[in-house]
């Protein structure tokens, strides 16, 4: 159990920070590919689509940004509802993109479907390589990692709203200038700067 939690903390802190930065490099196919596969290790497969093309566009807009919890929302409610909404938004983004290109939204061109396939492949490989015990260790570590990622989202955006049409500024997120935390999370604590 301790090893699972330790691995989850490693994936959730340093892994999430590096994956997050790599998925923003949409003009670098290798970096994007690496970030997406890295997120597949910790149930973050949809992140590269919804985060980059949804959250950054709709930051703080109530009802359109599932990563910005409304004031009064509890963490576990945010965890479940926010996840479902992130998947729904990811599919919506892909549906719009693929329909504009004249392609079926449920085709192999859908990046969210790619994300599910990556996640399924990781789960299968972990199980085949290490059986139920290894799968259990990985599963717990992936959950810990996902909780850390969503905790960062929760505390970076909690209760902050932005009006439609208002520009995104550093005041639309909570930030931390702690040098140790920023070192381990690739400056993810400086969240306002990231969104500007």
Label the predicted regions.
Residues 5-118, 161, 167-196:
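Membrane-embedded catalytic scaffold of the fatty acid hydroxylase/desaturase
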Residues 41-42, 129-130, 147:
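Transmembrane helix irregularities
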């Amino acid at each position: 159990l301790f090893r699972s939690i330790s691995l989850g903390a490693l994936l959730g802190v340093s892994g999430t920070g590096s994956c997050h930065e790599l998925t923003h490099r949409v003009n670098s196919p290798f970096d994007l590919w690496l970030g997406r596969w890295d997120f597949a290790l910790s149930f973050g497969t949809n992140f590269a689509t919804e985060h980059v093309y949804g959250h950054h566009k709709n930051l703080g807009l109530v009802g359109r940004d599932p990563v910005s919890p409304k004031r009064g929302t509890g963490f576990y409610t945010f965890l479940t509802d926010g996840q479902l909404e992130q998947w729904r938004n990811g599919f919506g983004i892909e549906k719009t993109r693929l329909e504009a290109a004249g392609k079926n939204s449920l085709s192999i061109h859908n990046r969210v479907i790619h994300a599910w396939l990556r996640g399924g492949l990781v789960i299968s490989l972990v199980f085949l390589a290490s059986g139920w015990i290894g799968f259990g260790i990985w599963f717990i570590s992936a959950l810990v990692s996902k909780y850390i990622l969503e905790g960062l989202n929760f505390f970076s955006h909690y209760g902050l709203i932005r009006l439609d049409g208002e520009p995104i500024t550093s005041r639309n997120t909570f930030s931390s200038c702690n040098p140790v935390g920023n070192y381990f999370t690739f400056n993810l604590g400086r969240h306002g700067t990231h969104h500007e």
